[in-house]
Amino acid sequence: MIIGPRRLALIGAIVAVALAIIFYPLIVRTPIDLDKVSIELTKVALKPSTASEEELSLELTLTLTNLNNFTLTTSRIEYELFADGASIGTSVLSYESVPVNGRPALFPGDSIPLRHLFLYKYSDSGAETFSKIMSNSTQIDWSIRGSAFIESATTLETKQFSDEL
């Protein structure tokens, strides 16, 4: 059976469309300028109703700012929290199970606050920091260090950040 010119053109068109769909993310890449994305620790507050002798709940507010010319989002922020220079633990703020259209939108030239509950468990080595947080968390020098996955329509980049409050 010989393939005629019309069938050959049809097969070629189908292959071209399939290759365009498969290779589109590789061909069109939205470059994210990570220097135009900032992540700041803007608030750490003790939730008083949850304070116990075993565990403290701290509400962190991270402010993400996007100075790029297109909308971005984040799927995951991993961080380590420090109180007066001492590490009190690590945590993850994740939107990975949320569809892309439900994740926090970082619009161009705009900032968005993200709140996350950080659980700090009592330990003998951190007893002094634990009691200081329970008595007055505003007198503590808070700092944070971590990484965030920043996404555009076709690109995923990792942004390293650190900040002090």
Write out the residue ranges for each language-model feature.
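Intrinsically disordered, low-complexity Pro/Gly/Ser/Thr-rich segments with frequent PxxP/GP/PP motifs
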Residues: 85-126
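Short, hydrophobic/aromatic beta-strand segments
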Residues: 70-78, 90-92
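Short, solvent-exposed loop/turn segments enriched in Ser/Thr/Gly
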Residues: 54-61
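Asparagine-centered strand-capping/turn motif at beta-strand->loop junctions
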Residues: 62-68
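Short structured motifs
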Residues: 42-48, 98-102, 127-131
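Membrane engagement elements in two modes
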Residues: 1-53, 149, 153-165
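Terminal connector regions
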Residues: 120-165
